[in-house]
């Protein structure tokens, strides 16, 4: 899908967990969005002190309403300022960007395991919706730091079985998503995952020979492959071989890039 740029209007902004916000934008640009796993590059406002856009993954798309939903963590100056924006405000958006999850890898009737960690959870929701529509059976394992950080448990339950893990044990299973997968003996035909690098490393080590795809979280400058700020090296490749996470990714087959 060719990238576009335009202005979208904030129609909803809600804190859904500690420092995590659900942002719903509306406008014609949404008609160009369809692939799960892509992201939008959002300019927070027109001030000169925040020139760089913020990459935010797409959590859901409603083409009929021309609305796109994103969930982001207000951790830095830019995202905190975005969290303060009110309904009715217009924001400048570039996107959709990147290569998303390959839906065609999961065939009708196959078992799919979605594994998300923290702010890596949102893009898996729209992916799960599309997979269920295509006839796949979806199980989700979602990891968070603590109960205060948990979001979207109920929406994921509408897709299939859901397992929640918290690092401090305050909600769901104590520990990490990999612990839950082992304890519940969860198996799959295809795995899709997005989350922090340590989680992706653990999944890569375990499922290198399986049908599995990971989405990398990375700071980005331009979002279109021009600045080389989000380069990662190719597994077993030559020294000069690399991938740009913003354009070649953020989704890669497991084992393709060095984490």
Swiss-Prot record:
Its cofactor is [2Fe-2S] cluster; FAD. InterPro entries: Cbr1-like_FAD-bd_dom, Cyt_c3_hydrogenase_gsu, Dihydroorotate_DH_ele_sf, Dihydroorotate_DH_Fe-S-bd, Dihydroorotate_DHASE_ETsu, FAD-bd_FR_type, FNR_nucleotide-bd, OxRdtase_FAD/NAD-bd. HAMAP family: DHODB_Fe_S_bind (MF_01211). Binds 1 [2Fe-2S] cluster per subunit. Binds 1 FAD per subunit. FAD binds at residues 54-57, 71-73, 78-79. Belongs to the PyrK family. Responsible for channeling the electrons from the oxidation of dihydroorotate from the FMN redox center in the PyrD type B subunit to the ultimate electron acceptor NAD(+). [2Fe-2S] cluster binds at residues 222, 227, 230, 246. Pathway: Pyrimidine metabolism; UMP biosynthesis via de novo pathway; orotate from (S)-dihydroorotate (NAD(+) route): step 1/1. Heterotetramer of 2 PyrK and 2 PyrD type B subunits. This is Dihydroorotate dehydrogenase B (NAD(+)), electron transfer subunit. Residues 3-103 form the FAD-binding FR-type domain. Pfam families: DHODB_Fe-S_bind, FAD_binding_6, NAD_binding_1. Keywords: 2Fe-2S, Electron transport, FAD, Flavoprotein, Iron, Iron-sulfur, Metal-binding, Pyrimidine biosynthesis, Transport. NCBIfam families: PRK00054.1-2, PRK00054.1-4. It comes from Shouchella clausii (strain KSM-K16) (Alkalihalobacillus clausii). The keyword Acyltransferase does not apply.
